[in-house]
């Protein structure tokens, strides 16, 4: 896959840029020797994607051994399907529309409900930026609740629940019955710390999904205005997911570049995307992203609300924020980060911190509380927020506005006071049947990471935990994808459901596309390490397949099975670029005479030969005895 061309910060001709990007995307998404395939659900319109990596045969002295294809979880959407026609100006296919219609509990509104949304729709200055396929928004009918949590508590298995059950299972229940996968599916026992991890793929059923959602332990972020979505699940008892961030600022990025970053993030495996835009044309940029996003999109609505006040936190009002929530919900945002736990009485607790309040949303609300000496309006209006959320099935991501910004401040009084308030708000949201996940730190030394998970499980009643790392040391600017990846792997093992990626540019500047790639790959491996540690069924399949390819010097399969095939091959080719090196039984690290795996194979061949010789000697001995044990006849 080729690295994307640099996109101009702004050319003034987004339509031309988007057309060029549409033509180029298919080329970029070619995965080596693999294809996107679909598993059929109980109805024709439940087609669940996965990617199958095809392997080369193994050649031995005894003949040829076929290696089976390896299924992997796939987030690429239609961008990873060579057969799909991609036109960003048209958006993605609406795969959920029939499901929404059949439930009969939503209505198509005659027009937008948000004042700001209406204003933007009629602003001639932004006409050239608007997505040209705008549809009228849906909302729950009066007195109806349309959340996945509500359905789950009613005992209803929705198509979304069936979809994610098939997606999590990856057809491993079928493969476990096939002899060619027997050795590849062996894995170490996990340590799940009390989680209800399935022990076999056939336990990952739509009913299992429904129960986990009904209990509040998992969420399916799926706004009714995001019909393009391929449903996914976030929960302690499922695969660990990762989030990638994007967003423009006042000084960088164009609309096209943000769409490109979204697609680029999907290419490397982001399960969800958060649009953290704070610059111009936030509304229009978000529309383009959602209409072309097969994964859930999250936002921090207070950022846009602040932009509407000209950046003056004191001028924020509940009415302004409420209109922003409705605006974004009607566009199709799947989850909102809302910093409702930053209470007025908690702000003084941060005074003696080394780095104070580092959350942008947390600092905005703290400043508002102090300026007005009133309680956080997100807290006092929380029930009204829930009414909006359940009308569109937007999930809460309850923000950790008082998260520690350095390891010195980790696990302090203010952090856990806010966490306990988030637990209170979780209970309140659940009374409305609104889905909830909880955001977590941050910066935490390794020995104190588990305490964060324990506190969250106890005080937030096992709602899914969603953490930013945590970074386990503060001495490595430029390498914070690693400092945070260490913490992420650990807290994922302890029970965190989703990890928010960190790039090498953390604390230093806005990430470019290569930084995004590095951040996502780092977090994919952290999430995978957590899945292995907690014993997710089938998690070790890809590891075993790659290890077998490595031992058999199937270099191309090693590249194909890796998280970043392009980089793995480029590193190999830096020293051994010749085509013949792809079949050589050594690499540049040890050379042909000192390769441990080559020597091991020779030892095995020798042992097999010795075994055959011993067996031949034993057979001759038996024959000698049977003939009377006479030396001479």
UniProtKB/Swiss-Prot annotation:
GO biological process: thiamine biosynthetic process; thiamine diphosphate biosynthetic process
KW Glycoprotein (keyword) present: no
E.C. numbers: 4.1.99.17
Annotated catalysed reactions: 5-amino-1-(5-phospho-beta-D-ribosyl)imidazole + S-adenosyl-L-methionine = 4-amino-2-methyl-5-(phosphooxymethyl)pyrimidine + CO + 5'-deoxyadenosine + formate + L-methionine + 3 H(+)
Pathway assignment: Cofactor biosynthesis; thiamine diphosphate biosynthesis
Cofactor(s) recorded in Swiss-Prot or TrEMBL: [4Fe-4S] cluster
Keywords, alphabetical: 4Fe-4S, Iron, Iron-sulfur, Lyase, Metal-binding, S-adenosyl-L-methionine, Thiamine biosynthesis, Zinc
Coiled-coil annotated spans: none
Superkingdom of the source species: Bacteria
Residues binding substrate: 245, 274, 303, 339, 359-361, 400-403, 439, 466
Subunit description: Homodimer.
Name of the protein: Phosphomethylpyrimidine synthase
UniProt gene name: thiC
């Amino acid at each position: 896959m080729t690295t994307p061309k640099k996109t101009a910060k702004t050319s003034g001709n987004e339509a031309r840029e988007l057309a060029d990007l549409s033509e180029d995307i298919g080329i970029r998404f070619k995965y080596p020797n693999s294809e996107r395939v679909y598993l059929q659900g109980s109805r024709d319109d439940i087609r669940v994607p996965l990617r199958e990596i095809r392997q080369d045969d193994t050649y031995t002295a005894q003949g040829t051994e076929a290696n089976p294809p390896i299924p992997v979880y796939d987030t690429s959407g239609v961008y990873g399907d060579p057969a799909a026609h991609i036109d960003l100006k048209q958006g993605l296919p609406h795969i959920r529309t029939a499901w929404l219609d059949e439930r009969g509990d939503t209505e198509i509104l005659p027009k937008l409900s948000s004042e700001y949304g209406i204003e933007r729709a009629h602003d001639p200055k932004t006409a050239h930026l608007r997505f040209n396929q705008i549809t009228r928004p849906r909302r729950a009918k009066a007195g109806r609740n349309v959340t996945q949590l509500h359905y789950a508590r009613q005992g209803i298995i929705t198509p979304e629940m069936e979809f994610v059950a098939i997606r999590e299972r990856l057809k491993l229940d079928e493969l476990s019955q096939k002899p060619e996968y027997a050795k590849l599916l062996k894995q170490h026992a996990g340590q799940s710390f009390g989680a209800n991890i399935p022990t076999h793929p056939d336990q990952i059923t739509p009913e299992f999904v429904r129960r986990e959602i009904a209990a509040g332990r998992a969420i399916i972020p799926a706004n009714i205005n995001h019909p393009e979505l391929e449903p996914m699940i976030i929960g302690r008892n499922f695969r660990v997911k990762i989030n990638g961030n994007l967003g423009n600022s006042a000084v960088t990025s164009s609309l096209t570049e943000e769409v490109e970053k979204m697609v680029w993030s999907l290419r490397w495996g982001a399960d969800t995307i958060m649009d953290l835009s704070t610059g111009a044309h936030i509304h229009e940029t978000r529309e383009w992203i959602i209409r072309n996003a097969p994964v859930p999109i999250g936002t921090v609505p207070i950022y846009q609300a602040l932009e509407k006040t000209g950046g003056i936190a004191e001028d924020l009002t509940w009415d302004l924020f409420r209109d922003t929530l409705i605006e974004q919900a009607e566009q199709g945002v799947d989850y909102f980060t809302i910093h409702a736990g930053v209470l007025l009485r908690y702000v003084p607790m941060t005074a003696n911190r080394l780095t104070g309040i580092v959350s942008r949303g947390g600092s905005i609300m703290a400043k508002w509380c102090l300026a007005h000496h009133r309680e956080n309006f997100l807290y006092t209006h929380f029930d009204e927020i829930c009414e909006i959320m359940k009308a569109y099935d937007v999930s809460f991501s309850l923000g950790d506005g008082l998260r520690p910004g350095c390891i010195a401040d980790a696990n302090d009084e203010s952090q856990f006071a806010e966490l306990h308030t988030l637990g209170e708000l979780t209970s309140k949201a659940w009374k409305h049947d609104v889905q909830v996940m909880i955001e977590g730190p941050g910066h935490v030394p390794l020995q104190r990471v588990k305490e964060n998970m324990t506190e969250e499980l106890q005080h937030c009643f096992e709602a899914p935990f969603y953490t930013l790392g945590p970074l386990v040391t503060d001495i490595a600017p430029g390498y914070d994808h690693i400092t945070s990846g260490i913490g992420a792997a650990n807290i994922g093992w302890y029970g965190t459901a989703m990890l928010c990626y960190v790039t090498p540019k953390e604390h230093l500047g806005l990430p470019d596309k290569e930084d995004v790639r590095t951040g996502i790959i780092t977090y994919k491996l952290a999430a995978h390490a957590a899945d292995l540690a907690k014993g997710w069924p089938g998690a070790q399949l890809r590891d075993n397949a790659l290890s077998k390819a490595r031992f058999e010097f199937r270099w191309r399969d090693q590249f194909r099975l890796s998280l970043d095939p392009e980089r793995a091959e480029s590193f190999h080719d830096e020293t051994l670029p010749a085509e013949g090196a792809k079949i050589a039984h050594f690499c540049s690290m040890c050379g042909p005479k000192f390769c441990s795996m080559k020597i091991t194979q020779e030892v095995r061949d020798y042992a097999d030969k010795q075994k055959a010789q011993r067996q031949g000697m034993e057979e001759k001995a038996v024959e000698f005895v049977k003939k009377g044990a006479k030396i001479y006849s």
